[in-house]
Amino acid sequence: MTEAKTLAGRVVIVTGGNRGIGLAIARLLAEDGASVVVSGRDAARLDAAVKELESLGAPALGVPADATKREDADRLVEVTRERFGRIDVLVNNAGITRDQLLVRMKDDDWDQVLDTNLRGVFLMTRAVGKVMMRQKSGRIINIASAAGAMGNPGQVNYSAAKAGVIGLTKASGRELAHWNILVNAVAPGLIETDMAAAIPAEAREAMLQQVPLKRIGQGREVAEVVRFLAGDGASYVTGQTIHVNGGLYV
């Protein structure tokens, strides 16, 4: 018997959905029947992501967008509405790292990470929130990080931004509940991505030793939690952060 596609008919935006965790999320939601819009700065990666999603039988669209620019956020929302008529789920996934010790960190390293990882979430949540308020329904899922809960040396910018995402999730979850808009966060730990692959082997091994499950997580394991939050089974969950980290932070 064919398994029912529980997200059939729903329209999803995944920012930064052209690579890494974002692409894993877009892929799984497409497999589950959703129409998926992915955004990112790299046009070639966007095209490749759209082709992959369409190969799964999903209506898909790639929109070049810079997460730090209000006009790009507004355009992404408008293009999605023009193509699909509504927005049911927003996954705020776009993010960057600019790691450095606190005393050596440049102003630009701080500003770029906060702009992309926190301001970008605010801009997209505000833009999509207006649409969902008119619909009187919606799901917003923010990709946070274990770093936002526990802090990471060499990542004061990233940790601060992701802690801000967790706070934004709590506040907007309470504020938007009146319109039946549920806002939650998923906080991954060490996940197999391009970012993780760039970590020096010695540092990567040291991080892995802190994970009780003694392995690196996979993007699909994060995506499965996003799918839950996007679906009907999470209809009484809002303002929460679900950690996917192999026990790194509990």
Locate the predicted segments by residue.
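Substrate-binding pocket helix/loop in short-chain dehydrogenase/reductase
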Residues: 101-102, 109-114, 196, 207
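C-terminal substrate-recognition "lid" of short-chain dehydrogenase/reductases
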Residues: 84, 122, 133, 137, ...
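Active-site helix of classical SDR
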Residues: 125, 161, 169
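The beta1-alpha1 cofactor-binding region of Rossmann-like NAD(H)/NADP(H)-dependent oxidoreductases
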Residues: 43, 64-76, 107, 220
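Residue(s) in the substrate-gating loop at a strand-loop-helix junction
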Residues: 145
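Conserved glycine-rich cofactor-binding loop
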Residues: 11, 18-19, 42
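Alpha-helical segment proximal to the catalytic Tyr-Lys
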Residues: 130, 174-178, 235
